[in-house]
Swiss-Prot record:
Protein's UniProt name: Purine nucleoside phosphorylase
Pathway named in the protein's UniProt entry: Purine metabolism; purine nucleoside salvage
UniProt organism field: Drosophila melanogaster (Fruit fly)
Residues where substrate binds: 204
Primary localization class, coarse: cytoplasm
Residue positions binding phosphate: 68-69, 205
Length: 290
């Protein structure tokens, strides 16, 4: 009922100003300058987000920043409160969510240092809450069977790709990302299995975040950085965590440039129809709707 009223209210508006939520790695706020910066400790029905929400503007566009693993990177992937993170972005009024991820590669076509905008996911996690509608006290009512095709908002994906092209950064235009439970890395046997399944890249944080954003009715897309080859590739030694962090820090400025360019370009367009479609998708997939 609440979601239906939100959709009806939005339909009465001619245009909807966008607000971009950015979820990324630790210390995300340091390389991105925000005007009118404010920090908010947001409460949600699912507990606290990973950190405070940093609210502000990038070139006049309203944005929110959140460090997925905490600003000190002290939350392991399985313990991230994905529901609280996405819900907090919704509560802050975000119309879109752009995220950054680190990927390890299962294919020769994705080499360390490459940027990728994935187009699909395989969820191989087992310990993470997958839905807001779990029947628990304080959770929203109902059972929602949200469709996951397409996994990401295609229009938002294309803006990330266009921004990377505008800046001259070679970027993979698609890829299937398998999300591991972590925190360990996978074995050679697992790598071979994942490759047979059609996975191109591995992550520890993309799911259930992408699923929850869809369930929240928020257009969502990922900009990933390939940090290492997985152990299936005998031509390269296994990368250490310190080496992976080094590669990410070395390339983080390029990630931020792509995000800022994409945000600027997105703000120049009318997103009213896309925002409403994302909300209507959720409203039309409740099992107990009348």
């Amino acid at each position: 009922m609440e979601a239906d009223l939100e959709v009806q209210s939005e339909l009465e508006k001619d245009t909807i100003p966008i607000k971009i939520g950015i979820i990324g790695e630790a210390n995300l706020d340091k390389p991105i300058y925000l005007a009118e910066r404010m920090e908010y400790a947001v409460c949600t029905p699912f507990g606290k987000p990973s950190d405070v929400i940093i609210d502000g503007q990038i070139e006049g566009v309203n944005v929110c920043l959140l460090s997925r693993n905490g600003r000190n990177h002290d939350i392991m992937p399985s313990n991230i409160n994905y529901r609280a993170n996405v819900w907090a972005m919704r509560k802050m009024g975000c119309t879109h969510i752009l995220v950054t991820n680190t990927f390890s590669s299962l294919r020769d076509t994705f080499q360390p240092g490459h940027l990728v905008v994935p187009n699909d996911v395989i969820d191989y996690t087992s310990r993470r809450a997958q839905t807001f509608y779990d029947g628990a006290v304080g959770s929203p009512l109902g059972v929602c069977h949200v469709p996951m095709n397409p996994t990401f908002c295609e229009r938002t994906r294309q803006h990330l790709l266009s921004a990377a092209e505008e800046l001259g950064f070679p970027t993979g235009s698609s890829g299937t990302v398998l999300t591991l439970e972590g925190p360990r890395y996978s074995t050679v046997a697992e790598n071979n299995m994942f490759r047979k399944w059609g996975a191109d890249l591995l992550s520890m944080t993309l799911c259930p975040e992408a699923i929850l954003a869809k369930e929240a009715g928020i257009p969502y897309a990922s900009l990933g950085l390939v940090t290492n080859m997985e152990c299936w590739c005998a031509k390269q030694p296994n990368a250490t965590t310190h080496e992976i962090i080094y590669i990410f820090k070395k390339q983080s400025e390029n990630l931020q440039k792509v995000l800022i360019t994409a945000i600027r370009n997105m703000a120049a367009e009318d997103w009213a129809e896309d925002i409403l479609k994302a909300k209507i998708l959720v409203c039309s997939n409740f099992a107990n709707s009348k």
